[in-house]
A protein has these predicted regions:
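Active-site-lining helix/loop region of Rossmann-like oxidoreductase modules
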Residues: 2-20, 46, 127-172
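NAD(P)-binding Rossmann-fold cofactor-contacting core
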Residues: 23-42
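Hydrophobic beta-strand scaffold residues
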Residues: 29, 45, 82-83, 106-108
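Short, ordered loop/turn segments at secondary-structure junctions
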Residues: 34-35, 87-89, 111-112, 142-144
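Short amphipathic alpha-helix with an adjacent loop that forms part of the alpha/beta core around
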Residues: 46-55
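N-terminal Rossmann-like NAD(P) cofactor-binding module of classical short-chain dehydrogenase/reductase
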Residues: 59-60
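Short glycine-/small-residue-rich Rossmann-like dinucleotide-binding loops
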Residues: 63-64, 87
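Rossmann-fold NAD(P)-binding glycine/threonine-rich loop
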Residues: 72-73, 77, 86-108, 117-119, ...
């Protein structure tokens, strides 16, 4: 069984993932990391990954950009693979993700849903067909006024898919 640490365990996605994992017989969450400890979980929760003494095979991260630097440092130090799903990272943090990926396995995705990943592929194909014919491609998104990262990580990933198909011609 895969033993995972849920980084950002008390956030919305952390709680969703924790609930899904309870129903799975291939993976278990053995510890959680979150600054907010006011939610009861079926595993021990630590306020930082550095203080977590529970052995695990991987860290699943749905936290926030402010927590990513320490996360990467500790994962590299402990040679602990990480699934990085936090969005809103700075250019410096993205460079740090790339650097960490040279030392430990890092899977980074702005959106893990099958539908969004299919949409990214479809957008690449559409961009290859439409742009040479003179079409402009634009992404417009709407969110509630409490949205933490705008544009969203998903919108940036969609734009990156289009831009990749267009040999990085577009600026956003």
């Amino acid at each position: 069984m895969v033993k995972a640490i849920m980084h950002g365990c008390n956030g919305k996605m952390g709680q969703v993932i924790s609930g899904l994992v309870k129903e799975d017989d291939v993976i278990e969450i053995v510890a959680g990391i979150d600054k907010f400890t006011g939610i009861e979980n079926p595993y021990p929760v630590f306020t930082s990954l550095a203080e977590c003494d529970v052995q695990a095979d991987v860290v699943i991260d749905f936290s926030n950009a402010a927590a990513v630097d320490e996360l990467l440092d500790v994962c590299v130090e402990k040679t602990l693979p990480v699934v990085l799903c936090t969005t809103g990272l700075s250019e410096e943090q993205l460079a740090k993700v790339k650097e960490a990926g040279e030392k430990v396995a890092v899977l980074r995705s702005a959106n893990m849903s099958l539908g969004v990943n299919l949409l990214m592929k479809l957008l690449k194909d559409a961009a290859k067909a439409l742009a040479p014919a003179g079409f402009d491609i634009e992404i417009v998104e709407k969110h509630h006024n409490q949205k933490v990262d705008a544009p969203s990580g998903t919108a940036i990933a969609l734009a990156d898919s289009i831009n990749e198909a267009m040999a990085d011609q577009y600026v956003y």
